[in-house]
Amino acid sequence: MKFKAKISKASILLKTVQNIMKIYNECICHITPDKLRFIIQSDFNDGMQVFCEIQRSLIFENFTIESLSDNEIQFQLDLESLRRVLQSATSNGVSDIFTNLTKVRGGPVLHFIIKSGTSGTVIFQDIPIVLLTAQQMAQINEPTLPDPLVHILLPNLKNLQKVIDKMKNISDCLKIMIAMNNRLSFEVETSSGSISTFYSGLDHPQFGDHVLSPDLQATVCVDIKKFAKVLHIHQLKPSEVVLCLYERSIIVHVVLTDIMITYYLPVLIKN
């Protein structure tokens, strides 16, 4: 088993890690000849999942990977440890960042070599990892779902985050309504009333050949704090963010150049 590469876009990788680790710190990293994937499946009670896929050519140069499993390698790692390494690697004066898979005192680690272009300093850092077999990786699958009940392109995420941050101080439950006539609303309720915000004129991307009626709409309730965590992705300046509602979950698809991130959040079931 062999993996080594030069990290050419450490700042992009850092921003991605900083955002997805808001969901959960433990992560599965899956490296293939074409892609780098981060998979987060938080504890059973939380129910959130994140699947992040980055085109290998965006992040790595001088890339080598070899394994008995179709040249794919997968392992568990701590995202905070990776964040700290990337943070130091993106500081002023750093010119080259290399990484490779190796062993330290008999245990597998992700080894980093950080070279400073100004002082000539070389820093070595290791992140302990837990290697996974191909059989274990085969059990980790992204959920397969039918077409959503309704879906819509979200408005400016930075502004939306400010709205949701104010709402989360009022209630734990966020009511989301999507109408297929370009409307979206968010609502929180209190014992004395409710607070809502409305958006109109939003687009509906098409899923497959099925065209939904403009009269169709759906409403679900989700944990507002979990939804607020997803909105931090605005820091990556995505080109498109699609919100999909299902009976038991919502999905947020985040599209960037050569990066796709999908968040799965469970719907709150009221008794």
Curated annotation (Swiss-Prot):
UniProt KW keywords: Cell cycle, Cell division, Cytoplasm, DNA damage, Mitosis, Nucleus
Signal peptide limits: none
Compartments, as annotated in UniProt: Nucleus; Cytoplasm
A Gene Ontology biological process term: telomere maintenance
Alphabetized Gene3D superfamilies for the sequence: 3.70.10.10
Pfam families registered for this protein in UniProt: Hus1
GO cellular component, one term: site of double-strand break
UniProt-listed SUPFAM superfamilies: DNA clamp
Disulfide bonds: none
UniProt function note: Essential in controlling the S-M checkpoint that couples mitosis to the completion of DNA replication. It is also required for the response to DNA damage.
Annotated PANTHER family: CHECKPOINT PROTEIN, MITOTIC AND DNA DAMAGE CHECKPOINT PROTEIN HUS1
Family that this chain belongs to: Belongs to the HUS1 family.
Protein name (Swiss-Prot/TrEMBL): Checkpoint protein hus1 homolog
